[in-house]
């Protein structure tokens, strides 16, 4: 292929990838985090290639082959192959084995955060040579990168489990490297190719080669005289169609969830226009999307907990604002819950108080963390404020519903032809 035809091909690929990246960004309600960054990188690549096309930039054929498009295409193909992609090109911070702060880019975060993917576009031979110490100075081998991923993932638990790591190879990976990754607990996706042992070196040279190397494994001398056979594919591994995730079976109920669960709004009482604007808005939200089925679905087959301060304050609010049916539902709900003493985690106790962070929320969310439970809440303000201080809680966030049964007597029934402002 000539340089000109290769350039045209690269430009076409870049344009197609931009369309796919834009579609990926829209594939999730609220968008995929990092989608804009991915599109921006692709547009920068396209702009560069178009400058080459017009003669504004001179480039060698070898440089044209090694543009970032290969990697960005691998990122998009990985994201398109997985479910519940929440972010791409996400930067995680972690402490390395020496306690130094480091950052790590995860190409795709999928399955609601439970899966991390590194997409690799480089050829198997180049990756294998770097592993053997034959790369350029400063090149980090895939095995070393895998160690970084394991270190970082252990510090970024999702629902109290470390994310599962997949290394996706789009230009193959050598069998010894694939086996090493599997030993480390990392899944491999892509074509696995054989390695042929060269007979060029004498036994003495083999011995020296092995003794001077800092590569992994006891068979280094063999690896050092080996060559990747890209034509000999010994296995092809696709992305798993269903990645098993260890589901947390414990749920911690926040006050907002307790109120939402028993609210008249959540039990059919949403056909009202209340004097309070916020209640009318919540009624409209309930008519649009019922919250109780979502709560029941998440709580199903799980152990329910609530800390003492949450239950105490819930009952106090209920006594003041609750209607008869809401109080009856609350009594039934509390019977299903294991009430535990307030026991906030160390991380929660380190949070600085603010307009969004108070001692009650620290106790509730911190107790959930101590229990290794997912906290159900409508208090997204606290969750964001805590995250801004570097403390991310395992949460299930839902829309709020207030206690409204006692307000129905002063409310107006919804007319048949009523259209709310958010429907206009």
Curated annotation (Swiss-Prot):
Task: Give the matching InterPro entries.
Answer: DUF1308, DUF5614
Residue ranges annotated as coiled coil are none
One Pfam match, given by its short name, reads DUF1308
Q: Which family does it belong to?
A: Belongs to the UPF0415 family.
Record-linked PANTHER family: UNCHARACTERIZED DUF1308, UPF0415 PROTEIN C7ORF25
What protein is this chain from?
A: UPF0415 protein C7orf25 homolog
